[in-house]
Amino acid sequence: MATIEQLGAEKYVLLTTFRRDGRAVSTPLWVVPDGAGLAFWTPAGTGKVKRIRNSGRVTLAPCDVRGNSHGEAIEANARIGDSTDRRRIGEGLKRKYGLLGRLTLLGSKLRRGEDGTLAILVS
């Protein structure tokens, strides 16, 4: 079983959040290591943000770009970061994902502005 720190080195991680009725919703995404945990960047109005606000319970598993898991899932807790976290995680995504990361973050900033995107911290 992978640890959160090991998942931070993966290119894609499958994040599973849970609806109020307990149904799971999975999404593949980019992650960066963040201290003893990991973090990701997401638009503020997404379903995953609503579900994380409701309950910070998540699972994480290594996956490919299409969300096909290739390892065991681990339980974790997620929380929404502040603007300082958002800037730090954005820089981490640029370092880890290079030009594609920079272009993705620029597109997000142009579409949504500074406050349209959130950092989610997972531990």
Predicted regions and their residues:
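Short beta-strand segments
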Residues: 10-44, 58-62, 71-75
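Short, structured beta-strand-loop surface elements
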Residues: 45-123
